[in-house]
Design a protein with these regions (language model features):
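Perimembrane helix-loop-helix junctions
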Residues: 2-3, 158, 169, 203-239, ...
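Membrane-interface alpha helices of multi-pass inner-membrane proteins
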Residues: 180-198, 204-211, 236, 241, ...
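Transmembrane-helix signature of polytopic, membrane-embedded enzymes
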Residues: 95-123, 139-140, 329
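Extracytoplasmic catalytic/substrate-binding loops of multi-pass membrane glycan-assembly enzymes
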Residues: 25-40, 50-68, 75-78, 249-251, ...
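Membrane-interface transmembrane helices that cradle and orient dolichyl/undecaprenyl
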Residues: 142-185, 218, 292-311, 324, ...
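Short periplasmic/luminal acceptor-recognition loop of GT-C membrane glycosyltransferases, typified by
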Residues: 57, 205, 481-551, 558-580, ...
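Membrane-lumen/periplasm interface segments of specific transmembrane helices
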Residues: 19, 227-272, 276, 287-296, ...
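Hydrophobic/aromatic-rich transmembrane helices and adjacent perimembrane loops
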Residues: 202, 363-379, 402, 411, ...
C-alpha cells in the first residue's frame, strides 16, 4: 500500500463513522440471541463453568473473552459494543489488505465498503452486537489466518527470488524465516478461529493446507515440513483447550450434550440447518443458484456491450461473415453495432425476467451464485498455476487467489446451496466471497477484452456499479435503522434502541422484575429473552440461555423443572417468540409441553407486559408481549404440593 491508498482508506473510515452514527445503539435485538450474548459471559464471570453449568453449542473462546472483559470493565452493553466495533474494524482492515494483494485501491475500497454495508451494518447479523460473538470472532480470526497465509506465500516468493539472484551466501534467507513465522502464526489464528466457531476454523485450516501444498510443490519433504509448521500450533491450541474442558465437564457434556462436534443433532436443529443450507429443497436451491448465475452473466453481457459501444469508433465494422475463431469474447469488438445492440437488449431482457419467475421463488441477490463462481474461478486459476509451474515461472498471486478461493468456498459450506446476502449468519461468511466477487469483475472479466480502453471501461463500469450498490444499501439501512428502532430502552447496564412494541414490553418487564423479586433472586425467561436477566442483575436458574426447539428434550425439561425447584424460582416469563424456523412454532404447545404444563400447574398468570395487555394474546401474534407467571404457594387454595406433581421420572430421580 502507498499514498494512492490514503484517500480510499479515508473514505472507508468516514463511511464507518457514518454507519456508527446512523445506527448508534440500534444494533441489537434484546429478544433473539442477544440475551445469550449478554448474560452468558456474566455467568462465567461469576465462576460458573461453560458447557456444564451454562450450556453452549459453540467454541469456548468468545464467552470467556467477554467474561474477561466484564471482569475488567464491568458488565455493560458498552463493553459488548466496544468488542463489536473493534472486531468490525479488524475485519474491514483485513478485507482491504487482502483486496490490495489482488487489486488496486479503487476496487479494494469497493470490496471493503461492500463488506461494511452488506455485513458489518446489516440489521440482522451486524458486527457491533451480533447474534453470536463466536461467529464474529471466528470471522475475524479466520481472515487473520488467511492474511498470514497470504503473507507466507509472498515471503516464500521473495525468498525464491533472492536465492535465484545468489544474494544469500549461507543459511536461510530472512524472507524465508519471516515466511515460516507467518505460517506458524496463521496456524495459531486458525486454531483460535476453531475455538470460536468450529466451521470457521475449518475454513482457515482448509486454506492453510492448500497454501502449504501449492507453496511446497513438487518437493514432498518441504511440503510436509511446512504443513507441520501450520498444523501443529492449531492442533496444540484446540486439543489443549478442549482437553482441559473435557477434564472438567466430561465427554458426554462436551461432545454430545453441547452439540459442539455436530453429534446427535436434534431433529429441530437438523431442520433449521437444512433450511439455512438449502438442502431442505435441493433441486429448487440448485435451480435458483443457476438462475442467479445466469443473471450475473446477463450483467456481464450488459457491461461488455456498453463498454464496446463506448470505446468503439463507428467506422470499425467487420465483414458480414466471421470465422469461428472471430466469435470469441476477446474479438467481440469486431462485431457490428447492430449485433452489439441486440446482445445488449437480450441481456437486459434476461436480467429483468429471471427474478420475475415467481413459481421458482427466485432469490435476487448475486451471491446466491457464489459457489458456482468460486468453482469457476478456482478452475481458471488452477489451470494458470499448472501452466506457470510447468514453465518454471510461478506467480505468487496465482497461489494467493487459489488460497483465498478455497477459504471463501469452505466458509460457505454451511449455506452452500443458499448463499443469501440477507439473514443473520451470512454476514460472517461472505467477506472473502465479496473480495473475490469484486476481483472477478476487475481481472478475469476485464481481461477478456483485447483492447486496453475497452478493458478499462468494463472494469470502471463494474466497480462503479458495486459502489452504486454500496450507496443504495447504505441509504436503505440508514433509513431502516432510524425508522424502525425508535424506542429507547434505558437500563442499569446500558441503553439500546429497539422497535417500539419490543422495547415497551422489555421496559415493562424490567420494572416488573425489580418490583416482584429481590436483587439476587432467580428469574426464568423462556424460550428467549435472558437479556432481562442481564439488565436486572437477576440470575438465570436454568442451564440454558435459550430454550427454543431442539435444546430441551424430555430429560432436559425434567432437569429444568428440578432447577426451578431447587433455586426456588418464583417468577417465570414466557416471551412471544414464534420459532417456525425450527419447525415447532409455539413454546408449550408444539415443544416443551412437559415444562409448560408444570409451570401452569405451579404458577399463576400474573401479568401481560407490552403495549397490549389483552390476556388472550397468543405466541405468534404480531404485537410483542411477555406473559408473567408468579409461583403459587404450595398447598394454597387446595392445590397439591409442588413436588407431588413433578413428572414421574423426576420423582424417581
Amino acid at each position: 500500500m502507498n499514498k494512492r491508498d490514503l484517500p480510499w482508506v479515508a473514505l472507508i473510515a468516514v463511511s464507518f463513522m457514518f454507519g456508527l452514527a446512523v445506527s448508534w445503539e440500534r444494533w441489537g435485538n434484546p429478544l433473539v440471541d442477544c440475551g445469550r450474548e449478554m448474560n452468558q459471559p456474566l455467568r462465567l464471570a461469576r465462576d460458573q463453568m461453560l458447557y456444564s453449568d451454562v450450556r453452549h453449542i459453540y467454541g469456548p473462546l468468545s464467552p470467556y473473552f467477554n467474561a474477561l472483559l466484564y471482569k475488567i470493565f464491568g458488565p455493560s452493553l458498552a463493553v459488548l459494543y466496544a468488542d463489536g466495533i473493534v472486531s468490525a474494524l479488524l475485519i474491514l482492515a483485513l478485507v482491504y489488505w487482502l483486496s490490495r494483494r489482488l487489486m488496486g485501491p479503487v476496487p479494494s475500497a469497493a470490496a471493503t465498503l461492500s463488506v461494511m454495508w452488506l455485513c458489518a451494518f446489516k440489521q440482522a447479523g451486524n458486527y457491533i452486537l451480533p447474534y453470536s460473538y463466536s461467529a464474529l470472532h471466528g470471522c475475524a480470526l479466520g481472515l487473520a489466518s488467511l492474511a498470514l497465509l497470504v503473507r507466507f506465500v509472498e515471503r516464500r516468493d521473495a525468498s525464491r527470488s533472492t536465492s535465484n539472484q545468489d544474494v544469500i551466501t549461507a543459511g536461510v534467507s530472512p524472507s524465508s524465516r519471516l515466511g515460516n513465522v507467518s505460517l506458524v502464526l496463521a496456524g495459531a489464528a486458525a486454531g483460535l478461529a476453531m475455538l470460536a466457531k468450529t466451521e470457521m476454523g475449518l475454513a482457515a485450516v482448509s486454506a492453510g493446507v492448500v497454501a502449504v501444498a501449492l507453496a511446497g510443490y513438487p518437493n514432498v519433504r518441504r511440503t510436509i515440513s511446512l504443513g507441520a509448521k501450520f498444523v501443529v500450533p492449531a492442533a496444540v491450541l484446540v486439543l489443549g483447550v478442549y482437553g482441559y474442558i473435557l477434564s472438567r465437564v466430561g465427554w458426554q457434556t462436551l461432545a454430545e450434550d453441547s452439540l459442539l462436534f455436530f453429534r446427535h443433532l436434534p431433529p429441530e436443529l437438523v431442520y433449521f440447518n437444512k433450511r439455512v443450507s438449502g438442502f431442505d429443497q435441493p433441486l429448487q436451491s440448485i435451480t435458483q443458484m443457476i438462475g442467479a448465475a445466469v443473471r450475473v452473466g446477463s450483467v456481464a453481457a450488459i457491461i461488455a456491450t456498453v463498454s464496446l459501444l463506448l470505446t468503439r469508433r463507428k467506422r470499425d465494422v467487420v465483414p458480414a461473415r466471421l470465422s469461428l475463431a472471430d466469435l470469441s469474447v476477446s474479438d467481440a469488438g469486431r462485431a457490428s453495432y447492430g449485433q452489439i445492440w441486440l446482445l445488449l437488449a437480450a441481456s437486459l431482457l434476461v436480467f429483468v425476467l429471471i427474478p420475475l419467475a415467481g413459481v421458482l421463488n427466485w432469490e435476487k441477490g448475486p451471491y446466491l451464485a457464489m459457489p458456482l463462481l468460486l468453482v469457476g474461478l478456482m478452475g481458471l486459476e488452477f489451470n494458470r498455476y499448472r501452466k506457470q509451474s510447468n514453465e518454471g515461472a510461478l506467480n505468487s498471486q496465482t497461489i494467493i487467489v487459489l488460497v483465498v478461493t478455497v477459504y471463501a468456498l469452505a466458509s460457505l459450506a454451511r449455506v452452500i446451496l443458499r448463499v443469501r446476502s440477507g439473514g443473520a449468519y451470512s454476514s460472517y461468511l461472505l467477506p472473502a466471497s465479496v473480495i473475490l466477487f469484486t476481483y472477478a469483475w476487475v481481472h478475469p472479466f476485464a481481461a477478456m477484452f483485447r483492447e486496453d480502453k475497452t478493458r478499462r471501461a468494463a472494469r470502471n463500469i463494474a466497480v462503479g456499479l458495486i459502489l452504486a450498490d454500496v450507496v443504495l444499501t447504505a441509504g436503505l439501512l440508514s433509513y431502516r435503522y432510524r425508522d424502525k428502532n425508535t424506542y429507547m430502552l434505558k437500563t442499569d447496564r446500558g441503553t439500546m434502541l429497539a422497535v417500539p412494541d419490543l422495547g415497551e414490553a422489555m421496559n415493562e418487564a424490567i420494572g416488573f422484575i425489580k418490583r416482584e423479586t429481590g436483587d439476587a433472586e432467580p428469574v426464568a425467561v423462556m424460550p428467549e429473552g435472558t437479556s432481562l436477566n442481564f439488565f436486572t442483575g437477576r440470575p438465570n436458574p436454568l442451564r440454558e440461555e435459550i430454550t427454543t426447539p431442539g435444546y430441551l428434550d424430555r430429560e432436559g425439561e425434567e432437569r429444568a423443572i428440578r432447577q426451578l425447584l431447587e433455586s426456588n424460582t418464583r417468577l417465570v416469563l414466557v416471551t412471544n417468540r414464534a420459532t417456525s424456523e425450527f419447525g415447532p412454532k409455539v413454546f408449550g404447545r408444539d415443544y416443551c409441553q412437559t415444562l409448560m404444563q408444570w409451570i401452569e400447574q405451579n404458577f399463576d398468570e400474573s401479568a401481560i407486559l407490552g403495549p397490549d395487555h389483552d390476556p388472550n394474546q397468543q405466541i405468534g401474534d404480531k404485537t410483542f408481549f411477555i406473559r408473567a407467571y408468579r409461583k403459587r404457594e404450595p398447598g394454597a387454595d387446595g392445590s397439591e404440593p409442588v413436588a407431588a406433581i413433578l413428572p414421574r421420572s423426576s420423582m424417581q430421580k
